[in-house]
């Protein structure tokens, strides 16, 4: 985003004023309001959590009885009822580490994005690949009837990923929150009712 555009960004300004770590908080707030992905007392796994705005929203939605564990390659500062750890979703041992630390999750939230190269085909394929890795972890820790949400770069592999997730959930829906920038290709795949 160009510096001039950032100054005009309504959600960025609100995030700063309301103490969120990034404007992405409003995407999850909107999704959770519409689909109730996270409820009071939920245990939540946040994959790709840095800088931590989704952890903030998840911790608030889960409340005092809830727990949030964020995982990212980068450090994300912990919060009340939210811990973070460094980890790579493509590391096959991460699922077991998360399961030992968290137990079963009621919701998995995933806002993963690769380091963008500027080559759309490469970036899209890489982002979808990260989602498949995250879905493997989700499959290990998500409780039956649990919910999930994944950021998806729209493109040639998005429908295939949605179909893959559709086999695991009672309902899936692709949506674009108003907090997403209009020019962004990101969509969010909401997945409800994990079949386990």
Swiss-Prot record:
Chloroplast recorded as keyword:
no
UniProt GO cellular component terms: cytoplasm
Q: Which Pfam families match?
A: FtsJ
- The positions flagged as active site in the entry are 151
Q: Which residues cross the membrane?
A: none
Known catalytic reactions: uridine(2552) in 23S rRNA + S-adenosyl-L-methionine = 2'-O-methyluridine(2552) in 23S rRNA + S-adenosyl-L-homocysteine + H(+)
Record: residues binding S-adenosyl-L-methionine: 52, 54, 72, 88, 111
What are the recorded GO MF terms, alphabetically? rRNA (uridine-2'-O-)-methyltransferase activity
Can you tell which superkingdom this protein's organism belongs to?
A: Archaea
Disulfide partners: none
Where it mainly occurs, coarsely classed, is cytoplasm
Per UniProt, the enzyme's principal EC class comes to transferase
Entry similarity comment = Belongs to the class I-like SAM-binding methyltransferase superfamily. RNA methyltransferase RlmE family.
**What's this protein's function?**
Specifically methylates the uridine in position 2552 of 23S rRNA at the 2'-O position of the ribose in the fully assembled 50S ribosomal subunit.
Name of protein: Ribosomal RNA large subunit methyltransferase E
Q: Which organism is it from?
A: Cenarchaeum symbiosum (strain A)
